[in-house]
C-alpha cells in the first residue's frame, strides 16, 4: 500500500499531456496525429518527419489587445490549414524549453481541444539524440476544427485586482528575478510585480541540461514550497502569456485544475497607470 502511494505521488496526474521523443518517433506519421513545429527558425533546414510548421507569432493577434488572442474563426482556419481536426491528437515542440509549445497547448485548451501534448525536451532533445529529420513540408488536407472558447481560463486585469491577497487564490509570476525587481523593464513603462504574487520562474520547472520537465514530485514541491496548493485557484502571468503557459502546463500536469492565464500580462499591467504595482523594498 505504501509503495502504491509513493508511485502515485511520483507520476503525473495527466501523463498523456507529455510525450517523449521515442513515442513521437514511433507515432508521428500515425493517422489522427499531427506534430506541430513551433520553433522560431530552422524548420526548412530540418524538422521532425511529418511535422507541420506554425510560427510562434501566428497565434498572437496584434489587433486584439490586451489578450491578443485570435478570434475563434481565425483559429479554426489556422488549425484547419494545418490538418488539425476535432479528433486530432496534436503534438507540439519548439527549441526554447516549451514557451512557444506551451502557449499553443494552452490556446488549444482555451478553444476546447484537450487532445494535445508537448514533446518532452522539444527539439533540443530530438537533435541531441540524433533522430531522423526531414526537409519536406507536408501539405495535409484541410480539416474541420471547431473552436469552443472557454473564457473562464482567461483572467482579466480586473480579475487580478480582485484576487490580490484573496484567500483561495494564488497569483504566480513566471518572469525572471530581474523583471520582478524592476531592473529589466523590457520596454514596459513600469517595473515590479503584482502584490501577493509568488515567483515560480518557468525554467525552474525544467531539467537545466535536458530541458525536459522535472518529475511530478519535484514540480509539486516547487509550488507547494511557495504556498501554491491544489485547492486554490491559480492565476499565472508573465509579460505576454508565453512563460505563464509553461507554469500552467506544469500545474495541469500534476493535477491542479482551477487554472487561469492573465493573458494581458505585464505588457498590460505595467503599461497602465491604474494598476497597483509592488516593488522590492
PLM features: what roles do these ranges have?
Residues 1-7:
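Sec-dependent signal peptide recognition
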Residues 7-281:
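Cytosolic catalytic domains that perform sulfur/thiol-centered chemistry
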Amino acid at each position: 500500500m505504501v509503495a502504491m502511494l509513493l508511485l502515485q505521488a511520483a507520476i503525473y496526474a495527466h501523463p498523456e499531456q507529455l510525450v517523449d521523443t521515442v513515442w513521437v518517433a514511433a507515432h508521428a506519421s500515425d493517422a489522427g496525429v499531427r506534430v506541430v513545429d513551433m520553433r522560431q527558425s530552422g524548420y526548412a533546414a530540418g524538422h521532425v518527419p511529418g511535422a507541420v510548421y506554425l510560427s510562434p507569432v501566428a497565434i498572437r493577434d496584434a489587433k486584439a489587445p490586451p489578450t491578443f488572442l485570435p478570434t475563434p474563426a481565425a483559429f479554426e482556419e489556422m488549425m484547419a490549414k494545418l490538418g488539425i481536426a476535432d479528433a486530432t491528437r496534436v503534438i507540439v515542440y519548439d527549441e526554447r524549453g516549451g514557451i512557444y509549445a506551451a502557449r499553443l497547448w494552452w490556446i488549444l485548451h482555451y478553444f476546447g481541444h484537450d487532445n494535445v501534448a508537448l514533446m518532452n525536451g522539444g527539439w533540443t532533445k530530438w537533435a541531441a539524440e540524433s533522430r531522423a529529420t526531414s526537409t519536406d513540408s507536408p501539405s495535409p488536407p484541410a480539416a474541420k476544427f471547431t473552436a469552443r472558447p472557454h473564457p473562464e481560463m482567461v483572467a482579466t486585469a480586473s480579475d487580478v485586482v480582485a484576487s490580490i491577497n484573496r484567500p483561495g487564490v494564488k497569483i504566480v509570476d513566471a518572469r525572471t528575478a530581474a523583471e520582478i525587481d524592476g531592473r529589466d523593464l523590457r520596454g514596459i513603462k513600469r517595473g515590479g510585480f503584482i502584490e501577493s504574487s509568488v515567483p515560480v520562474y518557468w525554467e525552474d520547472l525544467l531539467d537545466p541540461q535536458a530541458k525536459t520537465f522535472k518529475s511530478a514530485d519535484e514540480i509539486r514541491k516547487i509550488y507547494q514550497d511557495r504556498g501554491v496548493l491544489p485547492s486554490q485557484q491559480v492565476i499565472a502571468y508573465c509579460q505576454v502569456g508565453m512563460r505563464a503557459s509553461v507554469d500552467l502546463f506544469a500545474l495541469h500536469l500534476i493535477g491542479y485544475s482551477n487554472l487561469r492565464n492573465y493573458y494581458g500580462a505585464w505588457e498590460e499591467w505595467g503599461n497602465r497607470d491604474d494598476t497597483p504595482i509592488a516593488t522590492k523594498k
